[in-house]
A protein has these predicted regions:
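Catalytic cores of DNA base-excision repair glycosylases
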Residues: 3-224
């Protein structure tokens, strides 16, 4: 079985340096909203457009003219109305909780509790904010990361998504050192690979740098031969 470290080295060689999510909590929240059902390229284009307005603070989200805000958010792809609603709901939440950054930097339990009411973020988004924004050693097992890890054999397969996520997180926790940088690197590259190459349907296996050691790809190849 391919080691996680070897897999990450190959992904780094294939994709080159990847930009991590912003570490400022509200900007990271905006990043998550733009990232929802989108591609990294579209997400980054929309974030850059909001930065140019500028509209990357809770107050500026509300002060920006609707047409300007819509034009920027539309760059992230479909679901524009849902994204706008999520941005405004998040802006309200952050204005009501000006001490959020301090709470996130406390204990992991305190950080989780601080984000519990921010429903638009979701579990993976909350964990990503805790990892990249507050240096807590959690694994943000979003759908992309979970799919890639599972296909590589990290985490026992399960038809139950929640159980699969738990299995994946346990397997990655056992395979990764406790260092925050190592966990950020794993989260960044596994999730990115799942969003652009190791797709849920019709994955781009011929170009994948992990192909020769991927048990799922081998099983598929054997089924067709």
């Amino acid at each position: 079985m391919l080691s996680l470290d070897e897999a990450l080295q190959r992904l780094h060689a294939f994709y080159g340096p990847l930009t991590p999510p912003p570490n400022e909590p509200f900007i990271m929240y905006v990043w998550e909203v733009l990232n929802f059902h989108g591609s990294p390229v579209r997400r980054d284009a929309a974030l850059a457009a909001l930065r140019r307005i500028p509209a990357l603070t809770p107050d500026s989200i509300w002060k920006t003219a609707p047409k300007k805000l819509e034009a920027a958010v539309l760059l992230a792809g479909p679901y524009m109305d849902d994204r706008i609603k999520a941005l405004r709901a998040g802006a309200d939440f952050f204005r009501r909780h000006p001490d959020l950054s301090q709470r996130l930097s406390g204990t992991l339990l305190a950080g989780r509790r601080a984000l519990r009411s921010l429903r638009q973020l979701g579990l993976a988004g909350s964990h990503r904010m805790l990892l990249f924004g507050a240096a807590h050693p959690v694994i943000p097992a979003d759908a992309h990361l979970t799919r890639v890890a599972s296909r590589l054999g990290f985490g026992a397969p399960s038809a139950n998504l929640r159980r699969q996520i738990r299995n994946t997180r346990r397997a990655l926790n056992a395979s990764l050192p406790p260092a925050i940088d190592a966990r950020r690197r794993a989260a960044l590259y596994l999730s990115h690979h799942g969003s652009v190459t190791c797709l849920e349907f019709d994955p781009h296996c011929p170009v994948c740098p992990l192909l020769r050691d991927c048990p799922t790809a081998r099983a598929r190849s054997a089924a067709f031969n």
